[in-house]
Amino acid sequence: MTGDAVTAFFEDLGSRGYDPLLRSVSATVRFDLVSGKTTERWLLTIQKGDLSVSHRNARADAVIRLSRDLFERVASGETTLLPAMLRGEVVLEGDYKLMIMIRRLLRTRLTVRRREAAAGYARRQQ
């Protein structure tokens, strides 16, 4: 990802449209990204697999709260949410099952990043 990893992540997520892994899910997840005294909010709406993202504060079935810096590292594929949760750097409120769904979406980006890195490595070896 280039530029702001957080914005790029949510724009990419919103542009995916339909995710077959989430075809049975209808829920909302709000990300509260904290930076100093400022909280940036992103709302992910999943409607039977259809994904949409908005940059607003609204009630949600689950809220994931973490620092913006940490989410930048997650969005760029440098780290994942689970270790950060175990360290107490991520707070989850609401439906914990949705966390598993979100991890799938984040893992998809991490997998793409690893494939891109592997492809770049393979090209350099030729």
Language-model-derived ranges and their functions:
Residues 1-126:
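Feature captures hydrophobic
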